[in-house]
Amino acid sequence: MDKLVIKKGSALNGTVRISGAKNAALPLLMTSLLTDSPCRYTNVPRLRDINTTTALLRELGVEVALPAPNDIVIDASTLESVTASYDLVRTMRASILVLGPLLAKQGKANVSLPGGCAIGARPVNLHLTGLEKMGAKIEVDEGYIRAKVDGRLKGARIFMDMVSVGATENLLMAAALADGTTILENAAREPEIVDLANCLIQMGAKISGAGSDKITIEGVETLNGCDYAVLPDRIETGTFLVAAAVTGGKVRCTNAAPDTLDAVLDKLEQAGAKITTGEDWIELDMEGRKPQAVRVKTAPHPAFPTDMQAQFVTLNCVAEGTGVITETIFENRFMHVPELQRMGAEIALEANSAVSKGSSSLKGAPVMATDLRASASLVIAGLIAEGETHVNRIYHLDRGYEAIEEKLGGLGAIIERVKE
């Protein structure tokens, strides 16, 4: 098993190219199951979760080719199975996204109940009740979701009683091939939803309202293939910007999407950073200054993203003043706090908030990554901690960050991946 060894270095400085978004790429790859024509996806990040997804598709009998490092071509006309087994699904929650496409195209699907990061209950009931409203018959048996439909799914008005990105994605894909019009009420508004809708529209789907809380889908009988570039990763972008701010550096992120990061950029400016943006780049300048502590409350897009919460906890640890981070999306998402405390951070957990007394003097220590974004917060802490920090269990990190040690190293960080 690998770990990262990090030593305190100088401020980060330079340019880093942002990868395609994991959270956009995973549902995009599933759109291939809606058509018998080949689909080509570009700007796909090389990540553990992407490898899991392609393995899952191959298990279904789908042909998957990788003509270039960040390109994937999928031909689902060779599909042989509608069963997504426990062995693969247990490692990644997004595997549930095969359910809607398989059911819509094949009329049946058997999908193991999913796994992924251990950051609280993420129930799949919204996926299931939505599909049932479209005419699916579903039962959960021996750890598997077994779904079938006679003929095509039927368009329906579906109100989700809580905002769910995954359920919105699953139902959006299923509705693309349904008979009639589907209206998704209280839909998720994330940029990755818009990206998925744009890809489906390129394939011939009729969708309006993506990016709002009401999405309308007029079902069509068949979809075509696609040639589609994955949206830049706003969370990776935010992570590098926080790392630059914490180290007092100046970093430009290229191949970025500034309009997907409004809430994060606003908080970085509140922390004292100078932010400049172009059409596809963002630059943060914190040279000669120390961050100011900020108050952050996570909420569904377009508010502050929960996936940036851990990184801002680290920022508040070393900032001037007292900062408060309140988590409203997931319970049990402060597992990075005890690890930061091992490094000397003064953080108090109060209900669903992390209160950081700033100006902590962090010391290098062996720490353990507990989930994807928590591991990023520990890496950032290691960049400014005195001594040497060992971040263990970085398989979490590899699920969502492409070559993070190489990218940070290119900005001047002293970081290496070693075998334990």
From Swiss-Prot:
GO BP annotations listed: cell division; cell wall organization; peptidoglycan biosynthetic process; regulation of cell shape; UDP-N-acetylgalactosamine biosynthetic process
Residue list for modification 2-(S-cysteinyl)pyruvic acid O-phosphothioketal: C117
EC main group: transferase
Keyword Cell wall biogenesis/degradation (UniProt): yes
Catalytic activity reported: phosphoenolpyruvate + UDP-N-acetyl-alpha-D-glucosamine = UDP-N-acetyl-3-O-(1-carboxyvinyl)-alpha-D-glucosamine + phosphate
Cellular component annotations (GO), alphabetically ordered: cytoplasm
Keyword flag GTP-binding: no
Positions annotated to bind phosphoenolpyruvate: K22, N23
Subcellular location: Cytoplasm
GO MF annotation, one: UDP-N-acetylglucosamine 1-carboxyvinyltransferase activity
Pathway membership, UniProt: Cell wall biogenesis; peptidoglycan biosynthesis
Active site: C117 (proton donor)
EC identifiers of the protein: 2.5.1.7
Domain of life: Bacteria
UniProt binding sites for UDP-N-acetyl-alpha-D-glucosamine: R93, D307, I329
Keywords annotated in UniProt: Cell cycle, Cell division, Cell shape, Cell wall biogenesis/degradation, Cytoplasm, Peptidoglycan synthesis, Pyruvate, Transferase
Coarse class of the protein's main subcellular location: cytoplasm
Function: Cell wall formation. Adds enolpyruvyl to UDP-N-acetylglucosamine.
Family: Belongs to the EPSP synthase family. MurA subfamily.
NCBIfam families in the record: murA, PRK09369.1
Listed name of the protein: UDP-N-acetylglucosamine 1-carboxyvinyltransferase
Organism listed in the record: Alteromonas mediterranea (strain DSM 17117 / CIP 110805 / LMG 28347 / Deep ecotype)
Gene that specifies this protein: murA
